[in-house]
Amino acid sequence: MRKFNIRKVLDGLTAGSSSASQQQQQQHPPGNREPEIQETLQSEHFQLCKTVRHGFPYQPSALAFDPVQKILAVGTQTGALRLFGRPGVECYCQHDSGAAVIQLQFLINEGALVSALADDTLHLWNLRQKRPAILHSLKFCRERVTFCHLPFQSKWLYVGTERGNIHIVNVESFTLSGYVIMWNKAIELSSKSHPGPVVHISDNPMDEGKLLIGFESGTVVLWDLKSKKADYRYTYDEAIHSVAWHHEGKQFICSHSDGTLTIWNVRSPAKPVQTITPHGKQLKDGKKPEPCKPILKVEFKTTRSGEPFIILSGGLSYDTVGRRPCLTVMHGKSTAVLEMDYSIVDFLTLCETPYPNDFQEPYAVVVLLEKDLVLIDLAQNGYPIFENPYPLSIHESPVTCCEYFADCPVDLIPALYSVGARQKRQGYSKKEWPINGGNWGLGAQSYPEIIITGHADGSVKFWDASAITLQVLYKLKTSKVFEKSRNKDDRPNTDIVDEDPYAIQIISWCPESRMLCIAGVSAHVIIYRFSKQEVITEVIPMLEVRLLYEINDVETPEGEQPPPLPTPVGGSNPQPIPPQSHPSTSSSSSDGLRDNVPCLKVKNSPLKQSPGYQTELVIQLVWVGGEPPQQITSLAVNSSYGLVVFGNCNGIAMVDYLQKAVLLNLGTIELYGSNDPYRREPRSPRKSRQPSGAGLCDISEGTVVPEDRCKSPTSGSSSPHNSDDEQKMNNFIEKVKTKSRKFSKMVANDIAKMSRKLSLPTDLKPDLDVKDNSFSRSRSSSVTSIDKESREAISALHFCETFTRKTDSSPSPCLWVGTTLGTVLVIALNLPPGGEQRLLQPVIVSPSGTILRLKGAILRMAFLDTTGCLIPPAYEPWREHNVPEEKDEKEKLKKRRPVSVSPSSSQEISENQYAVICSEKQAKVISLPTQNCAYKQNITETSFVLRGDIVALSNSICLACFCANGHIMTFSLPSLRPLLDVYYLPLTNMRIARTFCFTNNGQALYLVSPTEIQRLTYSQETCENLQEMLGELFTPVETPEAPNRGFFKGLFGGGAQSLDREELFGESSSGKASRSLAQHIPGPGGIEGVKGAASGVVGELARARLALDERGQKLGDLEERTAAMLSSAESFSKHAHEIMLKYKDKKWYQF
């Protein structure tokens, strides 16, 4: 029978309804129909599911380790469970209740884990499947769980409670035993006070029948399980935090709240054998040391060849104010105090054997910190730490923005790795990472993926995210180009931010050319080139831009002289720029107002730039009339054009980073010219601003920079040329510059006059309902809110090669600008020829007059060719700029060609294109060059879109959106037919809005917590293959052999004493537990899950084989019995027949 597919029916319905609505929404005449494009994406290509979670577990609370499987488990205060094996093997699970995890216990080498939560629930997890699941849960109803202990190779779990009682749970059935240790029976009968909650439970390593119970008040009890009474009671004045056994079972050690350690002989309960205050000051006259901070945990580990290790956390003296948390390692007479960067949550000592009654031979200590995981090598002098292979440093500085790139050039990851490998710290342990359990998944994904994170300290990190793993590749520190403030009085002018003046807000990256551009919170932009060579930059290239919406009448020292629009360093002086040519940061107007001053001060000393990303140009917005610059809201870079553009709520600026010149510096209103649909006017005269048309096109004196500013970063350190030749060259360049300047001004004025005559297209009405913009806002987390139409911010920028006007017959380079009021404006770019002329002739920038309108702030723009394929922005392939090349080869590489993935290159396109525009409220597909609205889709009415991306999937493209109401939606292109609409995650904080992003091949991610990245997929194919891609946590490993008891110990009973716990705790001897004490909750696995927890795949196969043999044997026995019965039946039939023949002719009276 054929399976009924409801989604195909929905496809048909949505296709029919959308086509009907699209016919109504099309704004062009019926006779001018758009050519049909065959769309291949259907709803069955989409499915939403989480893939993996990377990063450090947020708010960790518990730690456990399986010494045989070599798997580490971390629980958190939010109920999350993170499991780590070998590098690349990670797993994330979540308790539905969200209660804090207070303790974790592995069933060692069984592929199972017990978690105890703060809501007094115990859960049994099956780790023998790629996605662990809960098999059983046990909810305690009348008592609070405080401590759990599961002996090695035992199925009985001891559970201590706040009331001081101990209950016993069978981990196979997850039911309570009737055996209970009551607190009033454990303590002295004469004692009148309650001993407090149970803080420790452990069995004697040499006698499983003896249970050591630690109570918070300071009482320790050795309980005999068989006789059900206390053998010994140990009392100390200070509260107990933890207890640990010596492996011989004759001594144990306790840590106390006054910073002391007490060592007790099992048979001497009167007083401790030894009292140690590790960090206490030893006073004279034998007095007791001053009390210290509590020792929260202690471990006692022995070695065959030397003194035992005593490892503890806490216990520092109270006078060490401000000292960082410490882990103390005491070995023999030496004491090492290891300082940690964060508070210690828990620690575990990794030992060679899982058996508690053998020499432990510790080799490492895992320390779980509040924001880090540290592994200390105990076998090497100095106790170095292991280099952590997990991606746990995402939060090293808080993440402020995030970008995700799938299907990158194949040479990118090796290139980034090679330069990042040189940044690694020295001094790590030489041993391999000891947590190496599990196996990698067999992923079918082979395309490279890169995640870029921007951070609050100004750093940018590149991560290899291929095949659902994460590994740091390279770290860039953008703050290196700025002067650091040494004291509060010398702080830079970062009044627009309280702290983190270097924080990254926006990242624009071209993977093909490897050009990187970042925008920071202090209204600064830095452009980087990638190089494999180390260079020394004598002077950091720098531009200052005066970007202002409105200028009040402010008196300046120059009187009526207006300040220049851009402030390039060095002006037009052809001579090399000395370091002091950087603008002074103390500039101010005559009435004390800060003016023409950037927020940060660029270094004026030579800068050594290591291989990797090297500074090409620093651009800063300056203070104007006492007002700080507004933070940047949008950013775009294009390597083919050599341009970078950025905008904020004041306006837009475009910079030629090859010539180090400002090409465009306009307020947002001036972009409209006479076509402003809101009819806005500046509220005061603008003395320092030129008319809008001229301001857009005019190239000022300051925009042409000396040749030295156009050189590569190595120019400053290159050998000087002959002075006569240099003078001639400078004179020649000045002549060329003067001519090109005059020509550019003439062209600019002509274009400006033309641009003013261009009106708004008649088919796009400017009187759209502005009230729909109530949700419009900047995507930046700290940008000033836009509450008036006059504060229209630039929200999206896109370089492309397309039709700028209706009358265009061929595409040309241009910039599309989107604003927060839903307007799209098009700016034409006239680029000079490539090669040396590109460095000498100016780029002409002019408005096209094209204005398009949507509801809500513009988020994303892209372009399709006539076949529906995505037209990517033009780019220049990467090349090494710091290596001299042959002239003809250099000319060849200097030519910038736009590259397209469509069948026909963009130079040959004569047919129409489609512009895809996504705003906070709707999406439109505009046909070019006619500028008719081909398709329109209202994405949301009651919410707004936080992120929209045009992405490739299954050899096609679609629009993917994430809304503030938690819905993830996808639409086909170009018809904007709905394909997916799933409620996933509501917007709970700005962190999600700031970091959520889609990329190609159905991948997406966001920052789920301050320390973790959550990746998800909306591709059906990836969801189906996810099981294969995930790693396996459990691998069949033989349990190590138990330690040899030795001849004499076996003869005289000195070895470990075993205990038949089944007989002691089973229902037959101890009875049933009270039903009101705890409630059993079966997990999704049910009875089959129990089998899975007890055995797993290998065990099940063995059992199945055994069952098959038994079944075969039984079948054989049955066959034999059947044959015997058949033979007996035949014999009986034969005898009956003989008797019948014998008496057949006889009469009845003859018998």
Curated annotation (Swiss-Prot):
Pfam families: Lgl_C, LLGL, WD40
Region entry Disordered, spans: 14-34, 555-595, 674-729, 881-906
Regions of compositional bias (Basic and acidic residues) in chain numbering: 881-892
Residues with Phosphothreonine modification: T762, T784, T1039
Record's keyword annotation contains Repeat: yes
Entry membrane topology: Peripheral membrane protein
Location within or outside the cell: Cytoplasm; Cell membrane; Cytoplasmic vesicle membrane; Cytoplasmic vesicle, Secretory vesicle, Synaptic vesicle
Stored Gene3D superfamilies: 1.20.5.110, YVTN repeat-like/Quinoprotein amine dehydrogenase
Placement of WD repeats on the sequence: 61-94, 101-140, 145-181, 200-234, 240-272, 294-336, 344-378, 400-477, 505-619, 633-695, 794-851, 860-934, 939-983, 997-1020
CDD domains in UniProt: R-SNARE_STXBP5
Biased composition (Low complexity): 17-27, 712-721
MF terms in GO: GTPase activator activity; myosin II binding; syntaxin binding; syntaxin-1 binding
Residue span, v-SNARE coiled-coil homology domain: 1086-1146
Modified residues (Phosphoserine): S692, S723, S759, S782, S785, S900, S902, S1058, S1131
Chief location category: cytoplasm
A Gene Ontology cellular-component term: acetylcholine-gated channel complex
UniProt entry keywords in alphabetical sequence: Cell membrane, Coiled coil, Cytoplasm, Cytoplasmic vesicle, Exocytosis, Membrane, Phosphoprotein, Protein transport, Repeat, Synapse, Transport, WD repeat
Quaternary state and interactors: Interacts with STX1A and STX1B via its v-SNARE homology domain. Part of a complex that contains STX1, STXBP5, SNAP25 and SYT1. Part of a complex that contains STXBP5, STX4A and SNAP23.
Function: Plays a regulatory role in calcium-dependent exocytosis and neurotransmitter release. Inhibits membrane fusion between transport vesicles and the plasma membrane. May modulate the assembly of trans-SNARE complexes between transport vesicles and the plasma membrane. Inhibits translocation of GLUT4 from intracellular vesicles to the plasma membrane. Competes with STXBP1 for STX1 binding.
UniProt record similarity statement: Belongs to the WD repeat L(2)GL family.
PANTHER family listed in its UniProt record: LETHAL 2 GIANT LARVAE PROTEIN, SYNTAXIN-BINDING PROTEIN 5
Protein's name according to its UniProt entry: Syntaxin-binding protein 5
Organism field: Homo sapiens (Human)
